[in-house]
Amino acid sequence: MVLFKVRKVCYLETYWKERVVEKMKVLFIGDIVGSIGRDAVEKYLPRLKKKYNIDVVIANGENAAAGRGITRNIYNDLLQMGVDVITMGNHTWDNKDIFDFIDDADYLVRPANFSEEAPGKGMVQISKNGVTLSVINLHGRVFLPPHEDPFAMAEKLIEEARQTSPLVFVDFHAEATSEKIALGWHLDGKASAVVGTHTHVQTADARIYPNGTAYITDVGMTGPYDEILGMTKESVIYKFQTNMPSRFEVPKKGREVLSGFFVEIDNQTGKAKSCERIYINEDYPFQG
């Protein structure tokens, strides 16, 4: 009996070693707004990397420069903080500095369904530990300026990406909840993850679709916690009360919030194995 038990244990250990599935762990950080948002990334990213053993960090940076686009210096600063890929959105061209460096920015992705004449690129591929992840940025068309069909562009780029690796991450920068959910279902089993950005409010619908695509309608914002979508309360309230023009400003001081989305992806199949919303501020402190 003793010999049998030893053999049985050895057999089970071998069996489970063969069953171990390697995964890529990806952290996506929601729309970084202004200096408060950048400070939140610098403050919490090292802790998040340690807690989740992150392989790749993606962040939406279209509001990183005082809410209006991104600059070369901010792009470089975010990379130095540990962000691997930066996605954009409808504010891509707000800061004219971007035209001077976007074509040379290897890890900056603007919406792929912008005009064919637009500089920059709509997909980048990054390799970590011998595994390649493709990151695609798309722009919605409902309640936003018109662009090319994001559904068709997604299919085209995913087919191209999967020739290299089945791991594909999509940031869909869109306004309408229905449009985001529709793309999520449309790409189920084709993309590893589809995350929504733009509205700056994190949604409570993180899930993995039946064919292995992790999804959340909006990751939320990383920026000023006590303001309105990252803009000063007073300017927004004034506009609602008076229906008069009001210049929205991003505060430089105040409490911060970091919103994120964590997903584990099977390196062999490209399917999501787990996902989790991340929301950190003084009311919901980081749990290390």
Q: Where in this protein do the model-derived segments appear?
A:
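Acidic, metal/ion-coordinating pockets
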Residues: V20-G288
